Amino acid sequence: MQNITQSWFVQGMIKATTDAWLKGWDERNGGNLTLRLDDADIAPYHDNFHAQPRYIPLSQPMPLLANTPFIVTGSGKFFRNVQLDPAANLGVVKVDSDGAGYHILWGLTHEAVPTSELPAHFLSHCERIKATNGKDRVIMHCHATNLIALTYVLENDTAVFTRQLWEGSTECLVVFPDGVGILPWMVPGTDEIGQATAQEMQKHSLVLWPFHGVFGSGPTLDEAFGLIDTAEKSAEVLVKIYSMGGMKQTITREELIALGERFGVTPLASALAL
């Protein structure tokens, strides 16, 4: 019998959650991570599944995700503990045939349930599936320190925030030319913040929750993690710049245009126009 804890997706979740905790992005039970799988990914591990999988209804049906398996982090679980006990802190779930709920096939032992931000994740998965023709498979939420700090001092406007991050590090425009979506402050763990996040995910692979954290999307765990890591690095540079009195020179609009042309990306027009 193959052990699901040795599968590429469980091992990938262990690495991503451990790395995020080591970065300081996921204190206590902060942060959550979901990865969309295929039936072929989980097929070799049926012998590991719960004999009687628990069923949990969704707060709203999501027919686009019908019959789709995911691996998810658990509610109230600490990222630092995923590596110690994957089955207690992670779960493989599968949405039912009409998208009205899901079964917990593996993990989330001791009656644990998926992250409270599952509505935001599933709604964002729906939008990224449509926006990327199914390419994006990962939604990651974390409390990236410097990105949060900037939401207190920068105007919380997509164009302004995006332009500052692009200027903070040359690679940013190449990595997220679609810019950073920004919500108003909202209560977490609700359908309302999930819907607002998903709406921004139609246009952006990164979405900031001011004074709280960031959502990132990507085709793989590495890509989603790297996207947030790149934005957070630029935010760290900007925090240092502002603490030293501000910019005396920066990457110009013309240079940003040249950068986009060199790497074949189309920068967010509103940010480029500033």
Curated annotation (Swiss-Prot):
Pathway linked to the protein: Carbohydrate degradation; L-rhamnose degradation; glycerone phosphate from L-rhamnose: step 3/3
Residues annotated to bind Zn(2+): 141, 143, 212
InterPro entries: Aldolase_class_II_sugar_metab (IPR050197), Aldolase_II/adducin_N (IPR001303), Aldolase_II/adducin_N_sf (IPR036409), Rhamnulose-1-P_Aldolase (IPR013447)
Catalytic activity line of the entry: L-rhamnulose 1-phosphate = (S)-lactaldehyde + dihydroxyacetone phosphate
EC number: 4.1.2.19
A single Gene Ontology CC term: cytosol
Intracellular or extracellular location(s): Cytoplasm
Note on how the cofactor is bound: Binds 1 zinc ion per subunit.
Cofactor(s) needed by this chain: Zn(2+)
Catalytic residues, chain numbering: 117
GO MF assignments: metal ion binding; rhamnulose-1-phosphate aldolase activity
Keyword Cytoplasm set for record: yes
Single GO biological process annotation from the record: rhamnose catabolic process
SUPFAM superfamilies, A to Z: AraD/HMP-PK domain-like
Keyword DNA repair (UniProt): no
Major localization listed first in the record, in broad terms: cytoplasm
Oligomer and partners: Homotetramer.
Function, as annotated: Catalyzes the reversible cleavage of L-rhamnulose-1-phosphate to dihydroxyacetone phosphate (DHAP) and L-lactaldehyde.
HAMAP family xref list: RhaD
Family, as annotated: Belongs to the aldolase class II family. RhaD subfamily.
Protein name as annotated: Rhamnulose-1-phosphate aldolase
Organism: Escherichia fergusonii (strain ATCC 35469 / DSM 13698 / CCUG 18766 / IAM 14443 / JCM 21226 / LMG 7866 / NBRC 102419 / NCTC 12128 / CDC 0568-73)
Biological classification of the source: Bacteria, Pseudomonadati, Pseudomonadota, Gammaproteobacteria, Enterobacterales
